[in-house]
């Protein structure tokens, strides 16, 4: 019988313990931030009826959808994000969860896009959303969560780029693009501006919408506007655009209101700026939208993005439920943290390893391990009484912070020898309490 070659599909990946532990550590940190703001967890299926998903995603997303017939002949698809399943969830359970509803969800999503650096076809999203209120307070709180999450991860240099879909709609209208379908196509192309550049964006606008050179030039000129200095000066500079139409006026007014709230907080004002090229590729956004880039690693793209979606539940319910939320791209953020050397990677969840010089000492070793665990110190016992060199080689490979050595003297005196694997300092024959204190100090 021929052996099967072990392999994974392009765009899909395994995670070895070091990376999986780093990811779990990251998710634990951001989950704690979510709960500090009062968000509660929910779970939804990976597989949904296709019609649940396809009416909400953009044309681009629908092309990337993993869609098929299941064994029962049902038209199903793998979820491409966690927001559309949320709309279905809230419509289905709104009486049980109550509104306004603040939730977070962590899970894998699937998109059949081209695999490349920082982009996978299966990746983990980490979403937090505020459903049931159109207050600008909710938009501000979502941005607070983004800020707090990145700071918690040790990232201090980042920019949250803000825009408003009404501003983009108004610019399109001013440039002669009036049909909703054409506006959505234009915004999808404009969203690529920072990724593929003006020349290619111009080509796509002319090819897909038949725009003339003057229309393209105007569209690119106004969607290239970015805030450079203080917000007060920036809003004065763009005030002339408010006279063009009501859409632009409303969008700018909403951004001003958001800035008023944010200015009262302890968020660094340099971390959030307006950028009229931010359109977001998903068709359901209706209000303020945002993307977050790392200042030291802009090439990796947005690590957290989102916006307001006042019409998301229209497919499932006649009742209008406003919502706003964001999604952290965990896999992309992990890649960025590793490149920035902010990721501590260990191949074990334990801080310490107990090694024995004889199998007769296993009982004492497990007793010590039990005592350490009762004091919230993750620890494990090496399962064989091998040569110390072999056991220490294993400890180095896994990345333990400490090694506890049990030899004849330690066994007889009910003490232990503790070695700090980072500093190399070793203290012989000390008590359990002394060792515990030393580990807790680190």
Swiss-Prot record:
Localization: Cytoplasm
Reactions accelerated catalytically: tRNA(His) + L-histidine + ATP = L-histidyl-tRNA(His) + AMP + diphosphate + H(+)
GO MF entries: ATP binding; histidine-tRNA ligase activity
InterPro entries listed in its UniProt record: aa-tRNA-synth_II, aa-tRNA-synth_II/BPL/LPL, Anticodon-bd, Anticodon-bd_dom_sf, His-tRNA-ligase, HisRS-like_core, HisRS/HisZ
EC number(s) given by UniProt: 6.1.1.21
Pfam families: HGTP_anticodon (PF03129), tRNA-synt_His (PF13393)
UniProt keyword Nucleotide-binding, yes or no: yes
Assigned GO CC terms: cytoplasm
Top-level taxon of the source organism: Bacteria
Gene Ontology BP, a term: histidyl-tRNA aminoacylation
Key word Cytoplasm present: yes
Keyword vocabulary terms for this entry: Aminoacyl-tRNA synthetase, ATP-binding, Cytoplasm, Ligase, Nucleotide-binding, Protein biosynthesis
Broad enzyme group: ligase
Quaternary structure annotation from Swiss-Prot or TrEMBL: Homodimer.
Homology family: Belongs to the class-II aminoacyl-tRNA synthetase family.
PANTHER family (UniProt xref): HISTIDINE--TRNA LIGASE, HISTIDYL-TRNA SYNTHETASE
Protein name from the UniProt record: Histidine--tRNA ligase
The organism of origin for this protein: Helicobacter hepaticus (strain ATCC 51449 / 3B1)
